[in-house]
């Protein structure tokens, strides 16, 4: 059952099956209710310097104790002040390059992380809250698409061309162009998620080609073959995607019609790119699948809940220290700047938000927040939201491919 309504600013939103309350006939609350009710976390630099203040106070107390003759107590105060903070800082510093540093793996699967041989494991990791029957349906659809995509690739009338461009800061970026629709002026620019590469776009390539799109599947900076020392969290990537859209406009001409799409971090990057003042006018539409609305708030939720399979841990001061260290590194930046919630109100193209209802990485309420931000701004007509039941992170396309491509096809057709 579809629900259709109007938001202020003229933007249209709709959500399919919003009234679903049961799974296999058993009443179940939304898996993400506890996160949707969590107060949004606001980054503060004071949180990063808090541990330093604690250390200084304890060392001062220790020095005072030693001065007045309480040597043992003074040493204990100093140890309590220095050791825990130093240990946490050291652990974060060692983990920082592993988490935010260049992610060069993920290229061994010819069909990418979702359609390749390890795709079943990836889907299960992304859909931990689903019943077995629901995961089996997703796996069936995934395997079916893998087979069809393989046959489609073998029959391509063109090759897969390695292409390059350069971002504003001189970072060399690499992608793969598939000009499978030479008669069409429509191009897809696709951005993958964290720790993946251009092959993640193969999950969607065949169906976008059927919609008349030539394809540009990019390696985000610090991923695949693209240069970059640090993962951009969407903030650095927004400028890279503007550069890629400009590349398409130069190649395909002024009458090119570009669809900018992405999943997860790539979706957030696409939204923020659409908010840039110099976005090429050829960009006619944006499809953002499971985009977070605020990277910092998402990271706090993931770290504190362990929703990616890691042990839950206190987000503060771990993330605060990581934020400070990354900002101080050469080529680093402030990860808290990555906030699609602010950018979507300035979008120069209509945005289709696709969201899995059972996403434990990017909770569904984030799509609602993005929809509200877009609908409340004078960003023009055409923004849409679709929620897909029984879909975990990046798995809406497998949970209900008919619904997914019905909505995406209509959106792409209407705006490009």
Task: Enumerate the language-model features and the residues they cover.
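Acidic catalytic loop of the alpha/beta-hydrolase fold
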Residues: 358-362, 394-395
């Amino acid at each position: 059952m579809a629900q259709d309504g109007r938001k202020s600013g003229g933007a249209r939103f709709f959500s399919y099956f919003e009234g679903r309350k049961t799974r296999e006939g058993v009443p179940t609350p939304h898996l993400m209710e506890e996160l949707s009710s969590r107060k949004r976390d606001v980054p503060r630099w004071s949180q990063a310097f808090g541990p330093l203040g604690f250390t200084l106070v304890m060392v001062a107390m220790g020095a005072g104790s030693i001065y007045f003759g309480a040597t043992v107590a003074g040493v204990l105060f100093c140890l309590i002040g220095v050791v825990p903070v130093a240990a946490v800082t050291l652990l974060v510093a060692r983990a920082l390059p592993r988490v935010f540093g260049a992610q060069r793996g993920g290229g061994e699967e010819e069909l990418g992380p979702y359609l390749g041989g390890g795709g079943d494991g990836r889907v299960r990791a992304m859909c931990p809250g689903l019943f077995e029957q629901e995961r089996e349906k997703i796996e069936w659809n995934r395997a079916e698409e893998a087979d069809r995509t393989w046959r489609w690739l073998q029959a391509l009338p063109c090759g897969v061309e390695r292409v390059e461009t350069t971002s504003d800061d001189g970072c060399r970026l690499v992608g793969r162009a598939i000009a499978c629709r030479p008669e069409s002026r429509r191009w897809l620019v696709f951005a993958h998620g964290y720790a993946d590469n251009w092959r993640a776009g193969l999950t969607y390539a065949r169906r976008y080609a059927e919609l008349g799109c030539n394809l540009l599947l990019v390696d985000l900076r610090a991923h695949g073959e693209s240069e970059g020392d640090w993962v951009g969290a969407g903030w650095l990537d927004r400028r890279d995607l503007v550069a890629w859209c400009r590349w398409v406009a130069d190649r395909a001409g002024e009458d090119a019609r570009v669809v900018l799409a992405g999943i997860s971090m790539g979706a957030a990057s696409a939204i923020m790119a659409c908010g840039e003042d110099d976005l090429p006018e050829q960009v006619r539409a944006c499809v953002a699948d499971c985009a977070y609305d605020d990277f910092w708030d998402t990271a706090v939720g993931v770290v504190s809940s362990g929703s990616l399979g890691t042990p839950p841990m206190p987000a503060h001061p771990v993330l605060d220290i990581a934020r400070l260290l990354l900002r101080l590194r050469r080529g680093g930046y402030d990860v808290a700047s990555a906030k699609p919630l602010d950018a979507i109100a300035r979008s120069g193209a209509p945005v289709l938000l696709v969201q899995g209802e059972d996403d434990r990485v990017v909770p569904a309420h984030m799509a609602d927040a993005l929809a509200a931000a877009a609908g409340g701004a004078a960003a023009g007509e055409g923004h849409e939201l679709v929620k897909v039941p029984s879909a975990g992170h990046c798995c809406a396309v497998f949970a209900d491919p008919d619904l997914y491509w019905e909505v995406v096809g209509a959106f792409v057709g209407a705006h490009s």
